[in-house]
């Protein structure tokens, strides 16, 4: 399954969850899109598991193949499988670019990475799924600092996560792996583990 390129607002309304983490999608209509969007549908256990998986997958904007591969990689790490899965997703380069505030959305962050605007430890990395380790630095190429999407993001109101830092010279750092209580509080990763282990 390829990466979804349609309206994330419709996805958010269908899932009743803000995949952009802003909540804006649900302000106007907090129900699904379409003629029957307001009808309540009773979900089975499988339905709840699938819905939770979709909420997380659309939040990070990854394909099903990448999502499953990351899930399988998490099973090889020490720790609780579901939590390690979330940590791996949170450690993606495109996500850290977003968490640093270089982009207003993960889609914009992915574009910055793919187009070669991002340096990791001083070297260009154009792979959005590149997994960062604590201590690595993330910066913009000098000529990329003046891009409109970068300037708009840097000038917007933004609460930076505690596990990343950014100095006045726009040198970002992935300080440490995040604790589970620091991000995505409305995601129940255990349901996703159950979905893939069914």
From Swiss-Prot:
Residues 91-154 form the S4 RNA-binding domain. One of its GO terms (biological process) is translation. It holds the Pfam family S4. GO terms for cellular component: small ribosomal subunit. GO terms for molecular function: rRNA binding; structural constituent of ribosome. InterPro entries: Ribosomal_uS4, Ribosomal_uS4_bac-type, Ribosomal_uS4_CS, Ribosomal_uS4_N, S4_RNA-bd, S4_RNA-bd_sf. SMART domains: Ribosomal_S4 (SM01390), S4 (SM00363). Keywords: Ribonucleoprotein, Ribosomal protein, RNA-binding, rRNA-binding. The keyword Ribonucleoprotein applies. One of the primary rRNA binding proteins, it binds directly to 16S rRNA where it nucleates assembly of the body of the 30S subunit. Part of the 30S ribosomal subunit. Contacts protein S5. The interaction surface between S4 and S5 is involved in control of translational fidelity. Belongs to the universal ribosomal protein uS4 family. This is Small ribosomal subunit protein uS4.
